[in-house]
């Protein structure tokens, strides 16, 4: 709205937005004559990641710690622009954008490049940014970040440690992991 009222545009690039959650699915959508749903997932094992996942995601922290990304406004600020962009490419105008946030507490000790995560601490997080159209989630960006491939075993995972996945329900339906 600010750009529109000021007669300006906003250009962002990088991984997110910039390829994995927007250009990758939209490129695959170009193969479809109809797109009903799109899910773009980032499924990563952070065991060897040296960045700040404690403050941002709460990994390694106590379960009651509220990390930065647990705030819905922050998730929408960081990833929200991608959701309506994909919706536009699918030919729909979203009614709303929602988010989810889940954490998984490890029952065992987990060793990372940054140290040890003790039992009873968060060792995986899953969050989504969802484009809602006529009461249904039609566009979804999903992130699952874990310490060890066996963490949060009921959550989505890829065939290798780090996966970018696109799942399009349409004509034809497309499933791609990179």
Task: Enumerate the language-model features and the residues they cover.
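A contiguous active-site-proximal alpha/beta segment in oxidoreductase catalytic domains
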Residues: 1-46
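Short amphipathic alpha-helical segments, especially helix-boundary/capping motifs
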Residues: 2-4, 58-63, 170-171
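A short glycine/serine-rich beta->alpha loop
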Residues: 7-13, 69-71, 178
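Low-complexity, compositionally biased segments
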Residues: 25, 96-99, 170-172
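Active-site-lining helix/loop region of Rossmann-like oxidoreductase modules
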Residues: 29-162
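A hydrophobic, small-residue-rich beta->alpha segment in the mid-to-C-terminal subdomain
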Residues: 158-178
């Amino acid at each position: 709205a600010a750009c529109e009222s000021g007669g300006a545009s906003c250009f962002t690039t990088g991984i997110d937005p910039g390829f994995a959650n927007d250009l990758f699915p939209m490129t695959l959508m170009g193969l479809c004559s109809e797109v009903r749903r799109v899910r773009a997932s980032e499924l990563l094992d952070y065991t060897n990641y040296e960045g700040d996942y404690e403050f941002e995601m709460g990994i390694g922290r106590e379960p009651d710690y509220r990390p930065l990304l647990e705030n819905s406004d922050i998730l929408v600020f960081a990833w929200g622009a991608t959701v309506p962009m994909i919706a536009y490419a699918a030919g729909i105008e979203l009614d709303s954008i929602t988010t989810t946030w889940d954490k998984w507490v490890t029952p065992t000790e987990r060793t990372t490049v940054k140290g040890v995560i003790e039992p009873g601490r968060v060792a995986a997080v899953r969050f989504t940014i969802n484009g809602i159209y006529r009461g249904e989630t039609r566009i979804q960006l999903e992130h699952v970040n874990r310490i060890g491939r066996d963490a949060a075993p009921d959550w989505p995972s890829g065939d290798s440690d780090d996966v970018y996945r696109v799942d399009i329900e349409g004509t034809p339906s497309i499933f791609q992991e990179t």
